[in-house]
Amino acid sequence: MRFALMIEAQQGLSYEDQLAIVRRAEAAGFESFFRSDHYASFPGSADQATTDAWAVIAGLARETSRITLGALVSPVTFRHPGNFVKLVTTVDEMSGGRIEVGVGAGWNDADHEQHGLTFPDIKERADLMEDQLALLHGLWEEKPGWKFDGHHVKVRGGKLVPGPVQADGRPVGKNGRRRPRIITGSEGSPRGFRLAARYSDEFNLSSSSPETAKRKEAELDAACVAAGRDPKSLTRSTMAGTLLGRDRDEVVRRADAMLAGFGERGKSGSEWLEARRNRWIMGTPDEARAMVRRFAEAGIERIMLQDFLPHDLEHIDLMAEELVGKV
């Protein structure tokens, strides 16, 4: 199993906080790091600070050397599709070719309402997502002069200079040149599967149990076959809440600290975790590894370990020590 560290940066994390986290993750042996892309904090914590995902990632790119970086996922409603391709390509150059790009339709209306952004209905957001994915491929892979007529975007004489960094191990486009890995994420809608089958290198299923992941994998396989694609060529991943402790007492202490960070003081951390046992990676190292094996049996190839204790850097060390290279 491959692992990435994932943080919810909109929960009050400054740039310096995120830099400390990614440096710790890189030193601990994580291969990749993702952060959320939200402009508003979650309900119950509306006054916490937020930062722009790609501005932060650009800074992190200059402060790290090995770990790959990305946002999981960037809503297509935040940035014009053409601007987003240029933005990602620029940050890719700054990183030396260590960027992965996650794309989603967006879901949090508060992100938009608080910042004057339009939040269209789900069909229009899915249309924008299709345009965004088409532009990523088109501007990275098509010859100069490319023409595109999408749902909301038109391109004439399309070209992108410079193109992505030609780093080893990256996907190769139809022009024979390498490009960043493209990840689409959703809870598994039929259209989301179709877009993943057509455009994605990886499909990320959010907050799912292994049983749901197994069922969704069959639907994703069918979408790949319908698109004329080998299902095995599409990597399957999941984002899973993660909380580890070396023993049960440490698990409960961390759960209580996590709830306090959510502004939910007075609740029982152990009871809160128990309600999520079928979809979180949690508990002692043995319990966590057992859950990882269940995801692997369901076809998951990479797990984004969603860490809700961003100031507990020892938790990052523990996740890396007990999971990375151990399952």
Where do the model's predicted regions map?
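Active-site-adjacent structural elements that line small-molecule/cofactor binding pockets in enzymes
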Residues: 1-327
